[in-house]
């Protein structure tokens, strides 16, 4: 069964379906490795981020293992019975693009129309993020409050629900698995700095700067998932205190509420650069 090129429609699901079919047909036997991400993208005629989403979906299903130094190994011929269903209509990269298009303009409007109490809410959300990052936890609670707060400060009530729906796509199994691989202490430190730039522009009433800062932040969020991650050890320059905070957080992981995604963060990515 040869690999076939695909039309650009919900690509990650099409790619996952085709690779799943090849695995089930025995073209890729259990214990063997799939072609590198780069080669799969070339054979399928699609982008590497779309291939990555598909591979993560297959990992969620229990068909493949995506491990540091081990490549993409087939570990089962059929999806695990206990595996969560990956049924999101849109992949993480498509969702991030939609957020970028929407939230950049909302940030500009927030700079022009934000009320004092709304701006205080943004500062509170940022403080929550900073506290979680300092504790070595993924700061999704404060992150969500911040992005919804920007929409509220923009004065567009219906779009608050739209932003919430897009943000909450992060709770699906595909986005969660991507985060397990690529979210690190360093990536959230960078994201925190980007949020601070957005807030500074909003507080200054500088709409163009707020628009640019939010656009930059969501582009960087996309790139941190889509681009090749740094080789192991690239984050070795993290301050010792930050690494210690992550280790301490790991030791007290039970304190994080189940399902909250405030999981302990690693100092470095789980994976080698995708190939």
Language-model-detected regions and their locations in the chain:
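Short linear motifs at protein or domain termini
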Residues: 1-108, 112, 233-235, 242-245, ...
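Short leucine-rich amphipathic alpha-helices used at interfaces
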Residues: 4, 11, 22, 28, ...
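A generic "alpha-helical surface" signal
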Residues: 13-14, 49, 93, 97, ...
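Residues at helix-coil transition
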Residues: 24, 155, 203-204
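Residue-level recognition of short, well-ordered coil/turn positions
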Residues: 27, 63, 137, 206-207
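A broad structural signal for alpha-helix termini and local helix breaks/kinks
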Residues: 44, 154-155, 229
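Conserved amphipathic alpha-helical segments that form helical-bundle/coiled-coil interaction surfaces
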Residues: 99-102, 107-177, 194-200, 209-221
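C-terminal all-alpha effector/ligand-binding and dimerization domain
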Residues: 169-275
């Amino acid at each position: 069964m040869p690999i076939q090129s695909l039309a650009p429609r919900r690509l990650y699901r099409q790619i996952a379906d085709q690779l799943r079919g090849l695995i089930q047909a025995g073209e890729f036997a259990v214990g063997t490795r799939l072609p590198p991400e780069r080669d799969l993208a070339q054979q399928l005629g699609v982008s590497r981020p779309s291939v990555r989403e598909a591979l993560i979906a297959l990992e969620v299903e229990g068909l493949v293992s995506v491990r540091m130094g081990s490549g993409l190994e087939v570990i089962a011929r059929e999806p695990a019975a206990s595996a969560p269903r990956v049924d999101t209509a849109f992949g993480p990269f498509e969702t991030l693009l939609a957020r970028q298009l929407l939230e950049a303009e909302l940030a500009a409007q927030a700079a022009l129309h934000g009320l004092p109490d709304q701006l205080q809410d943004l500062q509170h959300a940022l403080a929550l993020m900073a506290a979680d990052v300092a504790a070595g936890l993924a700061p999704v609670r404060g992150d969500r409050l911040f992005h919804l707060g920007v929409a509220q400060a923009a004065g567009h009530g219906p779009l608050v629900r739209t932003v919430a729906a897009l943000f909450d796509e992060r709770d699906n199994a595909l986005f969660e698995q991507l985060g397990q691989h690529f979210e690190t202490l360093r990536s959230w430190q960078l994201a925190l700095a980007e949020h601070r730039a957005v807030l500074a522009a909003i507080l200054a009433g500088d709409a163009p700067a707020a628009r640019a800062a939010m656009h930059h932040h969501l582009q960087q969020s996309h790139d941190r998932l889509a681009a090749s991650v740094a080789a192991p050890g690239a984050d070795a320059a993290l301050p010792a205190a930050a690494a210690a905070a992550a280790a301490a957080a790991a030791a007290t992981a039970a304190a994080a509420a189940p399902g909250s995604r405030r999981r302990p963060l690693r100092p470095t990515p789980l994976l080698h650069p995708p190939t």
